[in-house]
């Protein structure tokens, strides 16, 4: 009887421990989900200052890696190869993005954005969403939003399709066409085409920038607008 009672007590203790472990795991998941939601909400709040400017039509240049292309018939062509999760790409965009926008809107240069996805699944989702925004004529502002909320940790779970749709809505892209395009991954073939074309153009990392076919290299650790601007103007 004593042995049976002891065995019963051991079983009871074991189930209590299992239940406690399960509770800790479930609680951790719940807090993790709520924590991620809070972080997402806080990040999206940083988009409050980004409002859609007039739409700018782009095309997909399949001869140049399925780049999102703004062809203005200008003498200068700039190719930008980037991955949306790349922190150095954010540095480049923070320094030179507004200047590139003005070149496009004022038709002073042709600009091709090659959106890559080699940093992981979230890069694929962000690139797909970027192509979807381009279909709406709103790539430039969505591009700005991407870097405004870029996570400091790659593949952190931040860039879900839902978050990318919410990003679009936050800056004014509210069409069901955009939402469907993002959630269905409608542009992943174009995303893959960009990645497949890297070797053809000698691209080994991001950001990589070409001005009239010549690779541009910064001379300082930081990206300096005046340096990039001078290189563009020199052609």
Locate each region found by the language model.
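C-terminal cap of thioredoxin/glutaredoxin-like
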Residues: 1-48, 169-235
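Short extracytoplasmic/periplasmic juxtamembrane "stem" segments immediately C-terminal to an N-terminal membrane anchor
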Residues: 43-64
């Amino acid at each position: 009887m004593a042995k049976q009672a002891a065995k019963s007590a051991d079983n009871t203790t074991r189930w209590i421990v299992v239940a406690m472990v399960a509770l800790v795991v479930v609680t951790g998941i719940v807090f993790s989900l709520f924590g991620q939601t809070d972080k997402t909400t806080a990040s999206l709040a940083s988009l409050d200052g980004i409002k859609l400017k007039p739409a700018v039509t782009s095309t997909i240049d399949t001869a140049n890696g399925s780049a999102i292309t703004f062809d203005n018939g200008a003498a200068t062509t700039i190719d930008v190869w980037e991955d949306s999760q790349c922190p150095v790409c954010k540095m480049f965009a923070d320094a030179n993005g507004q200047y590139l926008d003005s070149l496009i809107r004022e038709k002073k240069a042709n600009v091709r954005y090659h959106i890559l996805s080699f940093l992981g699944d979230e890069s694929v989702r962000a690139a797909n969403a970027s192509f979807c925004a381009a279909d709406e004529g709103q790539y430039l502002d969505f591009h700005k939003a991407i870097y405004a909320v870029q996570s400091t940790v790659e593949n952190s779970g931040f860039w879900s399709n839902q978050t990318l749709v919410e990003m679009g809505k936050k800056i004014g892209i509210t069409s069901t066409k955009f939402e469907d395009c993002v959630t269905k991954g409608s542009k992943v073939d174009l995303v893959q085409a960009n990645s497949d074309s890297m070797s053809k153009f000698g691209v080994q990392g991001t950001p990589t920038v070409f001005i009239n076919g010549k690779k541009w290299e910064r001379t300082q650790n930081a990206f300096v607008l005046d340096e990039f601007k001078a290189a563009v103007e020199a052609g």
